[in-house]
Amino acid sequence: MRLETQALVPYPVRFDRSHHDALVVLGATATGKTALAVALAQKYQGEIISADSRQVYRGLDVGTGKDLALYGSVPYHLIDVCDPYEEYNVFRFQQAVYGIVPSILRAHKVPIIVGGTGLYLDAVLRQYALVPVERNQALRASLRGASLSHMRAVYFSLKDSHAVHNKTDLEDPARLMRAIEIAVFHATHPELLQQARETRPMMRAKVYGIQYPRSMLRARIRARLEQRIRGGLIEEVAALHKGGVSWQRLEYFGLEYRFTAQYLQGIIATRDEYVDLLFRAISRFAKRQETWFRRMQRLGVKIHWLVHTENGFVLR
């Protein structure tokens, strides 16, 4: 299922440095984004910046599909930058990109941002105004023991429901608490948000997206999942837990880690059930990714779609 990195011919990609200073490659899971990004980096003297919220973590290799051998001699950034117990978020990602992109440009190379974490990509392409927010112990104490529905009501009293960046925060109490904390800070410190807006660097990025027909994408997801299981996904999750990463923390790292952790604990009874449940969950996740990218388009991000057809990839 791997795309050959030297085969740029099937992709109608064009990049002119006089009009753009960066490239972005996005798409749903299992669409071959990394392979295309590596080929572009080889062609245009680029350096890759990973926009994957899980590849930042050391030790999460098989389940996140790091496949570092694919990069060859191409320099890459934001892979293996923190330990599993650390918090990594969209603010840290945005700040890192704002530092990395200028350094790549100063070296007369092309920054190539690649990934499928829509929130991270959107934060850079639409330049979210983000500021660091400390933990608010008094607020946390006031909401200790509150129900999820009450916490959601508090959150929506502070933030327009249509402006919610990451709706998965609404399903997890810890993440929802953090979202409330940030919303309260933003409401009480508007001057810092304004300052963040005024100091955002400009980046002229040309954005390409890879898209497959639904049936073909599901086949690619299935093949890649089986490849990862053969490649040691279950053993990786077991080793992470043995090394001190809790089952609860492992579930935070996404579907591969969540379902594998449940299988190892006996919550999922059989291997066949585990594989089937995980495949279905990843397929649903791919649909949510595509929905996010369509939302980005509606909000002004121009995406040049490379759509797979029976005659190869066409630009739409």
From Swiss-Prot:
Annotated HAMAP family: IPP_trans
Matching InterPro entries: Dimethylallyltransferase, IPT, P-loop_NTPase
Enzyme class, spelled out: transferase
Record-linked Pfam families: IPPT
Species, as recorded: Treponema pallidum (strain Nichols)
Interaction with substrate tRNA: annotated segments: 52-55
SS bond partners: none
Substrates-to-products reaction catalysed: adenosine(37) in tRNA + dimethylallyl diphosphate = N(6)-dimethylallyladenosine(37) in tRNA + diphosphate
Binding site for ATP: 27-34
Similarity comment: Belongs to the IPP transferase family.
Known function: Catalyzes the transfer of a dimethylallyl group onto the adenine at position 37 in tRNAs that read codons beginning with uridine, leading to the formation of N6-(dimethylallyl)adenosine (i(6)A).
Keywords: ATP-binding, Magnesium, Nucleotide-binding, Transferase, tRNA processing
Gene field: miaA
Site (Interaction with substrate tRNA): 117
Top-rank taxon, per record: Bacteria
UniProt GO molecular function: ATP binding; tRNA dimethylallyltransferase activity
BP terms from Gene Ontology: tRNA modification
Assembly notes: Monomer.
CC cofactor: Mg(2+)
EC numbers on record: 2.5.1.75
UniProt protein name: tRNA dimethylallyltransferase
Binding site for substrate: 29-34
